[in-house]
Swiss-Prot record:
Superkingdom, taxonomy of origin: Eukaryota
Protein name, UniProt field: Uncharacterized protein tam11
Gene: tam11
Ranges where the record places region Disordered: 38-62
Effect of a null allele: Elongated cellular morphology at division.
Length: 62
C-alpha cells in the first residue's frame, strides 16, 4: 500500500514538473517571438528613417 502511494506521488510530481516545463517553454517562445517582432519593427523603422534622410539630403546637394 505504501509503495503504491509513493508511486502515485512520483507520477503526480512528474506531471507537475512536466506541466511547469511546458509553461516555461511556452513563455520562452512567446518572448522570443516578441523580441523578433520588436527587432524586425526596429529594423524597418531604421531603414525607413535612412531612406527619408537620404531623400532629404538629395535635393540639398543639387
Amino acid at each position: 500500500m505504501e509503495r503504491e502511494g509513493k508511486e502515485d506521488v512520483r507520477k503526480a510530481d512528474h506531471k507537475i514538473v512536466y506541466g511547469i516545463e511546458r509553461v516555461r517553454h511556452g513563455i520562452n517562445n512567446f518572448f522570443d517571438d516578441v523580441g523578433k517582432a520588436v527587432k524586425s519593427e526596429s529594423d524597418t523603422a531604421d531603414s525607413k528613417r535612412s531612406a527619408e534622410a537620404k531623400a532629404d539630403e538629395a535635393p540639398a546637394k543639387m
